[in-house]
Amino acid sequence: MAKKKETPSSLSSSAPQIYEATLGRNGAVVKGQKITQLQAEARRRAGLDVVVCGGNLSANRSFAGAIERNANGNGKRCPPHPNAGMHALPHYQPDPRPPTGHTFYETPNRTAC
């Protein structure tokens, strides 16, 4: 039987949005085009970055974790890496690696640009 896909359990009126992502200067995460959850999972399987944006930290974190687990089977939640730069975002990444890349998510104090 196929594994059931995870989705965010509680969506607020401003549900998180997913975007393609690239890394900018000083750890900044730069938003690209808006994408669907399925597109985000495909990007993550290919080792590319995505970012979950919205005003609800809990929903963003939950959605990012679901994307990473659906794409790669297991995900490790990581704080912003100090060596990445002052604008780095928290994220999920495969554990163990590969593939490369991250599922970033916004917080009230750290956002994608």
Q: Locations of the language-model features?
A:
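Short Lys/Arg-rich cationic patches that frequently serve as NLS/NoLS or arginine-rich RNA/DNA-binding motifs
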Residues: 2-8
